[in-house]
Amino acid sequence: MRTPKPVVLTILDGWGLNEDTSSNAPVLANTPTMDRLFATCPNATLTTFGPNVGLPTGQMGNSEVGHTNIGAGRIVAMDLGQIDLAIEDGSFFRNAAMLDFAATVKAAGGVAHLMCVVSDGGVHGHILHGQAAVKLMVSHGLKVVVHAITDGRDVAPQSAEDFVAALVASLPQGASIGTVIGRYYAMDRDNRWERVEKAYDAMVLGKGEHARDAVSAVAQSYANKVTDEFILPTVIDGYEGFKAGDGLFCLNFRADRAREILLAIGADDFDGFAREKPVLSALLGMVEYSTRHSDFMTTAYPKRDIVNTLGAWVAKQGLTQFRLAETEKYPHVTFFLNGGKEEPEVGEDRFMPKSPKVATYDLQPEMSAAEVTEKFVEVIGKGYDLIVTNYANPDMVGHTGDLQAAIKACEAVDRGLGAVVAALEKVGGAMLVIADHGNCETMVDPVTGGPHTAHTTNPVPVILFGGPEGAKVHDGILADVAPTLLQLMNVPLPPEMTGKSLIDL
């Protein structure tokens, strides 16, 4: 088999397949390149949710899970399932790091602050984890304050009232809610420090909007026509901020959107905005957020090493690779694709155009796709063996719930893909086009009729362009992508990769 060069993986983040075309942005968009690829290239579908990507049954996938499985070439048991099981079997309540945190805060005479996503979306956090952690801390004689991060992005846009009410009803004596904060502020990942500062002020200083109780905080937000994701950081009556000796436990099990607020709270060298660092007795994370965070935090569930990822294995063969995505998805094609390893592999180059500085991406659905494409076309001619690129638009604009904007997002990506195909035709390269999960193919909630902003469990495409003559592709899972790329590169699989190539010759 001829070895094409480069071999390319293009990830259309959030571009799923849905037979219902009524709110299906990829179908409603003008996408001549994707239409051509579907019509002329071998294609099939991939499953991106549940046990096929290491998640509980029925749990939708997400970009972290997707890129981790893609890079690993095997099904990777994800943190959500691990933590759920620990709560179920009771080992959660015996977790050494959590017990150390509780003992340290108690010895300092402090309060245990718990930062928790209050939804059952299961992408960054889960309300059940928060309820379990409250139970654990109260059982050790600690006063507990919950900082409720409202979602509205991985669940319905106006579901926080029910989730917050359920959390309040479950709180034992000694536990209360101190703040209610939309994830737009508490979980930024694009260095928009003006947002993070508002969340910091509410949590740490007790400054912000005010409400008499947590449910009222959500209700008054709705009265102002502000949905869950965007709830202004709101301080509940009686909460006065962090005090010396207090401790913070962040329950996010996905790293990217927890990093900024935690740097503001815990890093000595933080310079995102002027602040006086709180004097905490303990700072605990559900998982490891980065090596920098590990300098000032402990971890309840340390990461497990994923040996011989796609990037590591390509590097071991003495081959070169390039990773490309705008800011919003850059960690996914680097950190997550490399199995949680931040440093590039030998022979791995990277480029990250900045995502546009807009409040929400429906205001600029093209995002930075043009810059991504310009660099993409350039590096196709540079002699790399493997190129991995992520187009963020379908997912990031899909999360806004704006169908017309999502259509524009798909069209912007399709234009870029057209230039990429032309560049590959010139050099004789091959490409797999896939998505890591669905999103923008369902922009209206079929139950409520309102905007649908979450990921889906729909199948996603896999298309082979420039592959071997007569090749076909079959349905599979994300763990099969790396073995497929390695087959195209004529590189043997490492023994750890249990995925199977999607190509039938």
Curated annotation (Swiss-Prot):
* Cofactor annotation: Mn(2+)
- Provide a Gene Ontology MF annotation, just one: manganese ion binding
Tell me which species this is from: Agrobacterium fabrum (strain C58 / ATCC 33970) (Agrobacterium tumefaciens (strain C58))
Q: What is the superkingdom listed in this entry's lineage? A: Bacteria
The record's comment on protein family reads: Belongs to the BPG-independent phosphoglycerate mutase family.
Checking InterPro entries in the record gives: Alkaline_phosphatase_core_sf (IPR017850), BPG-indep_PGM_N (IPR011258), Metalloenzyme (IPR006124), PGAM_B_sf (IPR036646), Pgm_bpd_ind (IPR005995)
User: What is the recorded name of this protein?
Assistant: 2,3-bisphosphoglycerate-independent phosphoglycerate mutase
Gene3D superfamilies on file: Alkaline Phosphatase, subunit A, BPG-independent phosphoglycerate mutase, domain B
Q: Which UniProt keywords apply?
A: Glycolysis, Isomerase, Manganese, Metal-binding
**Binding positions for substrate?**
124, 153-154, 183, 189, 254-257, 329
